[in-house]
């Protein structure tokens, strides 16, 4: 074989190899995407505690991964929940979604021992901060709030401070819930002040320092009717909204309050949703995306491989959210259609 033929053969082989690599990547991308065909939104895993983030024209959705284990339905004392990791999904149009897999686990914190409970991810100055609930080991032995950081919305995330941000001894001013320090939510107000809210049994509120990884001042409490857990902060126009899981008739509903500033006063506005189907808990996540507002939440209607939904096997859903002229939010009916294209 002369040198010209050898070069041609090498180029053909390289082209064929490149095509194989491209085909493999394309197939993988297709395997990691799915179409929104109604609620529940995610149908191949049990998911809970949705937390949306909009960044650069893409909506990222962070959820806890509920995983079934033998004997789960007879467990008690919080052991009904087996939430092993946080997953991330993304979309540019609310219809086609990409599954980015696991982006953080409780054991990614050296002091964490398990339980990937409710969280929120925010972006600030090119960094992504993951405020989250973790079961901590010694010397804490309780639910705490940690913070991880990444250069990308899909991770990897690493512990930002090497210890919990908020622990039990810091919140003794609240009426004791099952777990004081769970379900963090973040907002940056119009003055550039960062705030964090969280709680179970009591709704806590605190300022953050400009580095977003230290509290700034005292931890306050917000008196909200029937507050249970799962606060979510957002702003629309001149109003701030504090939406949360409230106690309904035996199960949780979503209620909310509004205020002219993060310092209050907070005015209760009643229920935003009824109880979630087949689920004791419900958890709000509210965001504006592509000119529309959305409420993410979870129920427990998904059946997966013959395993039915339950208190610890939930399924994330989404509905469009509408406002009245006075800024109050219209009651949201939970549907099977959700926001799927018709």
Label each region the model flagged.
Residues 13-21:
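Bacterial N-terminal signal peptides
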Residues 25-342:
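Carbohydrate-active catalytic/glycan-binding domains of CAZyme proteins
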Residues 2-13:
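Bacterial N-terminal signal peptides that target proteins for export
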Residues 1, 24-25:
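Extracellular attachment fibers and their assembly/anchoring modules
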Residues 1-2, 342:
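Accessible peptide chain termini
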